[in-house]
UniProtKB/Swiss-Prot annotation:
CDD domains: RraA_family. InterPro entries: RraA, RraA/RraA-like, RraA/RraA-like_sf, RraA_gpbac. This is Regulator of ribonuclease activity A. Keywords: Cytoplasm. Pfam families: RraA-like. It comes from the Bacteria. One of its GO terms (cellular component) is cytosol. GO terms for molecular function: endoribonuclease inhibitor activity; enzyme binding. The keyword Cytoplasm applies. The keyword Cytoplasm applies.
């Protein structure tokens, strides 16, 4: 499904929060949305590997990487795993790498920047925890919609029909 965050903001202005414009699209899918699963991890993507093995149909992985752009939390291997398990998209408050490969995937990926350095994979972090960045507080179960214009958040799914 294609999402237009500008239109959604016009229709649901009282129901959505607009995330500050921190992100660039790195995935092959320019718009995406779904129910979020939150993760907090700093320069370590081991927990992301575990979560992306789950069925991601209708889901978006929201990663609070502490805003670090020193180490990439998402790479081509994790992107392919997300596609294999039908995730709608990934939003990273941090960095990605192997961007030429990521843009070929049928997956929405928004992140702050790209860097060639990879993250550790020790599995350090927390999932399904409250995270806050971009002027918005995110909870697992909230609904996120993203396109090239921006990222918005709603407590409930928006009626898009």
């Amino acid at each position: 499904m294609k999402y237009d965050t500008s239109e959604l903001c016009d229709i649901y202005q009282e129901d959505v929060n607009v995330v500050e414009p921190l992100f660039t699209n790195f995935g092959g899918r320019t718009s995406f949305g779904g129910q979020i699963t939150t993760v907090k991890c700093f320069e370590d993507n081991g927990l992301l590997y575990d979560l992306l093995q789950e069925n991601g149909h209708g889901r978006v992985l929201l990663v609070d990487g502490g805003g670090s752009v020193r180490r990439a939390l998402i790479d081509a291997e994790l992107g392919n795993l997300a596609v294999q398990n039908e995730w709608e998209g990934i939003v990273v408050y941090g960095a990605v790498r192997q961007v030429d490969d990521l843009e070929e995937l049928d997956l929405g990926i928004q992140a702050m920047a790209a860097t060639p350095a990879g993250a550790a994979s020790e599995g350090i972090g927390e999932s399904d925890t409250r995270v806050n960045f971009g002027g918005v507080t995110f909870f697992s179960g909230d609904h996120l919609y993203a396109d090239n214009t921006g990222v918005i958040l709603s407590k409930d799914a928006l009626d898009l029909e």
